[in-house]
Swiss-Prot record:
Name this polypeptide is given: ATP-dependent RNA helicase DRS1
Region annotated Disordered, chain positions: 1-100, 125-258, 675-792
Entry keyword ATP-binding: yes
Record CDD domains: DEADc_DDX27, SF2_C_DEAD
Sequence ranges of Basic residues compositional bias: 35-49, 757-768, 780-792
Organism, as annotated: Gibberella zeae (strain ATCC MYA-4620 / CBS 123657 / FGSC 9075 / NRRL 31084 / PH-1) (Wheat head blight fungus)
SMART domains named among the record's database cross-references: DEXDc, HELICc
PANTHER family: ATP-DEPENDENT RNA HELICASE DBPA, ATP-DEPENDENT RNA HELICASE RHLE-RELATED
Record-linked Pfam families: DEAD, Helicase_C
């Protein structure tokens, strides 16, 4: 056996006392040793304590520090660190977490040239106009100063006209400051008095509340059909969905915290990092069912944590996946790019302490970068339907044969006619033996549509999802009297300049309205950004980030931003006009008052919006929400509208200049494209042609079907005839009611089925009568014979 003194300290992992006797250990080397080695040394020394000499014991007692001699702290561990529970996670997470970002999307963002800078165009025009007005103003100020030395200030009618001209021109900001205090006091009085819908008994004027709509024959006729539950549909639901007893066998045991759900430690760390300590009701009900591998149809109010309800069980199941071969096992589909980007951010935050890989596949981002990521076979793909089909058909080495879980977020939107063909293409390609989960704030109850997804006895988990808003939301309505519909923009400008001045999302039905409002706000000096489908992805992300970071006060958006978008600190939502349906209204106003916070939703409604407003007020009353009428000064509104009307020529010039710059940019792009075609002709022609599952004609047809379902064909008829009469509106409402199949036929006393049967019977009788006439009296050919008999 070799003697111990020949060993070197660097060759041994554990040092013995004999080694220490022969080879003295330097202090620097001991201090540099990691804690693991020191712990093992301590264990060894305990075993050999009996053989140690008193001098050696004294030497060991001298080492009192944790890391080495002299107790020098090397800063490896924070002295204030504590293993915290719920309180620590809550304190650290909620205060430090700043919301969901777009880092995942920026990685795959294509390098694009900056588009037309609308702010720069507006700024140039304002400076030009301000330059002229300041020259006139300085001359007037000098004259006023000379007069002020000799005479007192007298506000007569002439002076009032001069002040009105100043206010009417470029002194917009000063007007807002002067009237701001008065308006704030009026707002506080209205909030304290709580101008409730039920107490609105004032005389008819422009300031009357829209929250108490007058009864209408169509409304009275449709109320009964809306409230009644179709027995046949209810029977279908019972046969389609799994019984509630199977979904939740132990109803008493409701999860009060994530610890009781037996989630893995990495997921618990991810939850603590974002400040999630207690599950929301939808999460407490759906996560245990999803962990069992069952299909789920979930619905809950906006801002209730539906994304976490399907992300958490997915992460928990993927922790136990086979890891030898990378495999794509989960696909999450969402209707809009922004919602998919946000879902990707939520998932990556929650999975920060796991080895689960995610890929974002949405339109507007680099196709090649996404293809490279898909070749690595990530565990989860978060995508929009169009881009997912593109990769499914055209990306090499990408297969969906191993997909085990499919999630449709905002499922009711995905089931509409606009997405029907794309969704059908995806569902027929994915494996049949999969777990499917559907979530939305306004989940459809139509079994016929849910059957298309291929669900297998799904568990129905509904938590306050019957088209309800949260109770912390104050809903305000501003009524436009007949004849004042053309002053809608004046009402909006008055609200934004005097009432709600920051963190406001304004929704429009059409892109052109949002863009025009963007120009008007710029001319009025209101900082804003727009968000709609005509913008490229870089511009869309930039607009959301500017609004989120507080660089702009208003976000002018279409319904592109109405679903799922979670922007921290949104105080107010304004509807420029009431949306097409109550479902869209619920999603719009759900951008504020999220996760228990307070918020305000204001809707500018005219007589044509009566039906949706009535439904919103009725739903709000049913759940005890606060419905408030907002009264505005018609004089100030008219003044603002006049100011906006006088801007029409300037607005048209700005839009024309913007159009010219876009055309120039397009020509430059075409020139660059031609140069690339010449330089890289062989490579471009050698690429395989990308394919799609439907023709251009089918694409247009599906888009039109989506528009018709959304607008109820009203907009198309408006384009043809200019304006819809009350008769046309009633006819379209009845047609929509029949198409939905949710109510009875109200035109007569008989049901629709009976009337169809009667019509069919009458048609059959008519055909039989015609056939009988043909058989009994055949038509004679030639001229009729004369009365005199045959000729001889």
């Amino acid at each position: 056996m070799a003697p111990s003194q020949k060993r070197k300290p660097a060759d041994d992992f554990i040092f013995t006392i004999d080694d220490d006797d022969e080879l003295p250990i330097e202090e620097e080397e001991v201090v540099a040793q990691p804690p693991k080695k020191k712990a093992k040394t301590a264990k060894k020394s305990k075993k050999s304590k009996r053989d140690a000499s008193p001098e050696e014991d004294d030497d060991e007692d001298a080492v009192e520090g944790i890391w080495g001699f002299n107790d020098d702290d090397d800063g490896a561990m924070d002295s204030d660190f504590e293993f915290g529970g719920d309180e620590t996670a809550n304190d650290n997470g909620v205060e430090d977490f700043e919301g969901w970002g777009f880092e995942g999307a920026k990685k795959g963002m294509r390098v694009e040239k900056a588009g037309v800078d609308l702010d720069e165009i507006i700024r140039r025009r304002r400076e030009k106009k301000l330059g002229k007005s300041t020259e006139n103003a300085t001359a007037e100020e000098k004259a006023d100063d000379a007069e002020a030395e000799t005479m007192d200030v007298d506000l007569d009618d002439d002076d009032d006209e001069v002040l009105a001209d100043d206010a009417f021109g470029m002194n917009v900001a000063s007007d807002a400051e002067e009237s701001g205090d008065e308006k704030e006091e009026d707002d506080e009085e209205e909030q304290e008095s709580g101008v409730e819908v039920e107490d609105d008994d004032e005389a008819a004027s422009d300031n009357d509340s829209v929250a108490t709509p007058t009864n209408h024959p169509d409304d009275d006729a449709s109320d009964a059909s809306d409230d009644e539950e179709d027995a046949e549909e209810e029977a279908k639901r019972k046969a389609f969905f799994a019984p509630e007893e199977e979904n939740n066998p132990d109803k008493k045991a409701t999860a009060s915290s994530f610890q009781t759900m037996s989630l893995s430690r990495p997921i618990m760390r991810g939850l603590a990092s974002v400040g999630f300590t207690k599950p929301t009701p939808i999460q407490a009900k759906s996560i245990p069912i999803a962990l069992m591998g069952k299909d789920v149809v979930g619905g809950a109010e906006t801002g209730s944590g539906k994304t976490g309800a399907f992300i958490l069980p997915i992460l928990e199941r993927l922790l136990y996946r086979p890891k030898k071969i990378p495999t794509t096992r989960v696909v999450v589909l969402l209707p809009t790019r922004e919602l998919a980007i946000q879902c990707h951010a939520v998932a990556t935050k929650l999975a920060a302490f796991t080895d689960i890989k995610f890929t974002l596949a949405v339109g507007g981002l680099s196709l090649k970068a996404q293809e490279l990521e898909l070749k690595l076979r990530p565990d989860v793909i978060i995508a929009t339907p169009g881009r997912f089909i593109d990769h499914m058909r055209n990306s090499a080495s990408f297969s969906v044969d191993t997909v085990e879980i499919l999630v449709l977020d905002e499922a009711d939107r995905m089931l509409e006619d606009g997405f029907a063909d794309e969704l059908n293409e995806i569902l027929t390609t994915l494996p049949k033996s999969r777990q499917t989960m559907l979530f939305s704030a306004t989940m459809t109850s139509s079994v016929d549509r849910l059957i298309q997804i291929g669900l297998n006895r799904p568990a129905r988990v509904m938590v306050n999802s019957q088209k309800k808003t949260v109770t912390t939301l104050v809903q305000e309505f501003v009524r436009l009297r007949p004849g004042r519909e053309d002053k809608r923009m004046g009402y909006l400008a008055h609200v934004c300049k005097n009432l709600y001045k920051e963190r406001v999302i304004i929704f429009f039905r059409q892109k052109k309205d949002a863009h025009r409002a963007r120009i008007i706000f710029g001319l009025l000096g209101l900082s804003c950004a727009e968000l709609h489908g005509s913008m490229n992805q870089t511009q869309r992300i930039s607009s959301v980030e500017d609004f989120r970071d507080g660089k702009v006060a208003y976000l002018l958006a279409t319904d592109l931003a109405s679903r799922g978008l979670d922007i921290k600190g949104v105080d107010t939502v304004i509807n420029y006009e009431a949306p097409q349906s109550l479902d869209i209204y619920v999603h719009r106003v759900g951008r504020t008052a999220r996760a228990g916070r307070k918020g305000v939703a204001l809707t500018i409604a005219a007589e044509s919006d009566r039906k949706v407003v009535k439904a919103a007020v009725k739903a709000g009353k049913a759940q005890g929400a606060k419905i408030v009428s907002r009264q505005l000064d018609s004089g100030e509104v008219d003044a603002l509208q006049t100011q906006i009307d006088e801007m029409d020529d300037e607005i048209d010039e700005i839009m024309e200049e913007e159009k010219e710059e876009k055309q120039l940019a397009h020509v430059e792009m075409q020139v660059k494209k031609g140069e690339n075609m010449i330089q890289h002709e062989a490579e471009i022609k050698g690429r395989p042609r990308r394919t799609w599952f439907e023709s251009e004609h089918d694409k247009k047809k599906s888009k039109q079907a989506g528009r018709d379902e959304l607008n109820g064909m009203r907009e198309e008829m408006k384009k043809k005839t200019g304006k819809l009469s009350n008769k046309d509106k009633k006819r379209l409402d009845l047609k929509q009611l029949r198409a939905e199949g949710g109510g009875e036929w109200r035109k007569g006393k008989n049901s629709e089925a009976e009337m169809k049967a009667r019509h069919k019977e009458a048609k059959a009788k008519s055909q039989a009568k015609k056939a009988g006439d043909k058989g009994s009296a055949p038509k004679s050919k030639g001229k009729p014979k004369g009365k005199g008999g045959k000729r001889r």
